[in-house]
Amino acid sequence: GGINAALGRDDSPEIHAEDTLKSGGCIAGEQSVNGLCSAAPEIIRSLERLGVVFSRDENGEVALRAFGGQSRNRTAYAGASTGKQIMSALIREARKYEASEVIKRLLGRQFYSALIADGACNGALLYNEKTREIETVYAEAVVVATGGQNLLFGKTTGSMQCDGYAAAKLYEQGVQLKNLEFIQYHPTTVETPQKRMLISEAARGEGGRLYYIENGKRIYFMEDRFGKNGNLMPRDVVSKCIYDAPSQVYLDISFLGEKIIKSRLLEVAEVCKNYAGIDVYK
């Protein structure tokens, strides 16, 4: 995977924002998009200070790969373990605040409901998995970040714990909800008996090509329809085209070579081998 930031010499937060709004069908809030894109370069630098080792190019600059819906290469990545490195760095930082008692973590708890009185949220009720009791936590501000509702769609690349309970419970409690139709999903996956295993967009960012077979011939349908960068169209476009394909769709990265795959797409290779018995080097 990776994280987008306008770090290239031919790029800017303004171009980044323009690409983002265009890829989102101009539905996204322009002010929020501008703020996020403007902050992104400093976020990369902050993550570096926290210990994330981003890959470098031949000039020693943060390496940038292509991702869907972008007019510039602007996806920074840390080898084949971007997400893991970012999470590890943030957890280490959080533990510093925990050690100094600035924050307190409550482990083994699940969100049960919001604590609402007189139209205001004053905290939350949590289910203690160990004691099987409901606990009350009071707070001046409450953020419910429980991971969405991917499980409602059956097989998913997301966590099987993301069942939409929190949103449903808050709705029952009279909380106004918006934008529930926007569900994060991924167009390229490997099917397993239990769930879908994600094939990172990085595979297409490094040159992977989508195709189906017709009369014994490979049809590179994304390139046929959208040109040489067709495999890097926004996710909704790629997903619709895969869905409309007349037969099984495949993603070819074998031509990238073992060196590139091991250095940049190792996680993809391991997922395919361990969960589906597929050797991506062939």
What are these regions (language model features)?
Residues 2, 39-45, 49-54, 166-173:
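Hydrophobic or amphipathic alpha-helical targeting/insertion segments
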Residues 5-36:
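Glycine-rich active-site loop/strand segments that organize a redox cofactor
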Residues 28-41, 75-92, 106, 156-164, ...:
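Short beta-strand to alpha-helix junction loop
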Residues 48-133, 138, 145, 189-193:
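Conserved redox-cofactor binding core of oxidoreductases
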Residues 144-157:
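Flavin (primarily FAD) binding-site architecture
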Residues 158-171, 177:
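Thiamine diphosphate
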Residues 169, 175-281:
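An anion/pyrophosphate-binding glycine-rich loop and adjacent beta-alpha core
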